[in-house]
Curated annotation (Swiss-Prot):
It catalyses: L-aspartate + H(+) = beta-alanine + CO2. Its cofactor is pyruvate. The keyword Cytoplasm applies. The keyword Cytoplasm applies. The gene is panD. This is Aspartate 1-decarboxylase. It comes from Clostridium botulinum (strain 657 / Type Ba4).
Length: 127
């Protein structure tokens, strides 16, 4: 038996673009992808903090250190430029693996610069 666990999370990223006419996906700054342990073409869940939308897409790499977070294609209708989003990927692990596993959690500022990288998320409110 396996269980689906949080693998990677980029918390409170700011949407820099929404491009309806691009082939569907989310473009993420390659540096953020590398630090968060997210691969190109990996399936991700997006949660828009501002409007509550939740949806899935896949990742394409954006220019390193550009801060780009761009929703493309149909996903562009789910967000607006400036929205805060949470980007999450998951993995399937056995129970034994899950008990030893820690996710990669990346906190970013308003310009999508890395503020904190951790393997643990303290539960509580962010002010």
């Amino acid at each position: 038996m396996t269980i689906t666990m949080l693998k990677s999370k980029i918390h409170r990223a700011t949407v820099t673009e929404a491009n309806l006419n691009y082939v569907g996906s989310i473009t993420i700054d390659k540096n953020l992808m590398d630090k968060a342990n997210i691969l190109e073409y990996e399936k991700v869940q997006i949660v828009d903090i501002d409007n509550g939308n939740r949806f899935e897409t896949y990742v394409i790499a954006g220019e390193k250190h550009s801060g780009v977070i761009c929703l493309n294609g149909a996903a562009a209708r789910m967000v607006q430029k400036g929205d805060k989003i949470i980007i999450m990927s998951y993995c399937d692990l056995t129970i034994d693996e899950a008990n030893k596993f820690n996710p990669t959690v990346l906190f970013v500022d308003n310009k999508n610069n890395i503020e904190k990288l951790t393997n643990y998320e303290k539960h509580g409110e962010i002010i």
